[in-house]
């Protein structure tokens, strides 16, 4: 992994194997998201309809890869899992869901919970 925003910020020898694997997964996710963006830009820019179809197919493949990488990360990170479960596949205001979870009022959460946070 080259030195960049995707590089390690601490000495490799100071990092646990789990942190290194998480970093590897995160970099892969970032690369897939970037590829999705690049393909979309190419789709917008091309005048060739057949090339547009090929590029859209490629973009959709990268989208699948991003989803798979995100799911791997969710399975490895309990806090990420919690936040994804809170926000993904909801409707309504994302901010209202967050405010309801933190007890700040707002509208009910999109999951039918009436916006009532954990009682733990």
Regions found by a protein language model. Give the residues of each.
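Non-heme di-metal
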Residues: 1-120
């Amino acid at each position: 992994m080259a030195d960049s925003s995707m590089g390690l910020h601490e000495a490799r020898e100071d990092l646990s194997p789990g942190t290194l694997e998480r970093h590897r997964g995160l970099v892969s996710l970032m690369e897939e998201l970037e590829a999705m963006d690049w393909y979309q830009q190419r789709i917008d820019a091309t005048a060739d309809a057949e090339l547009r179809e090929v590029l859209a197919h490629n973009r959709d493949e990268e989208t699948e890869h991003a989803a798979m990488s995100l799911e791997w990360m969710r399975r490895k990170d309990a806090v990420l899992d919690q936040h994804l479960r809170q926000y993904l596949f909801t409707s309504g205001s994302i901010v209202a869901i967050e405010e309801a979870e933190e007890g700040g009022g707002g509208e009910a959460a999109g999951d039918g919970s009436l916006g009532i946070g954990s009682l733990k």
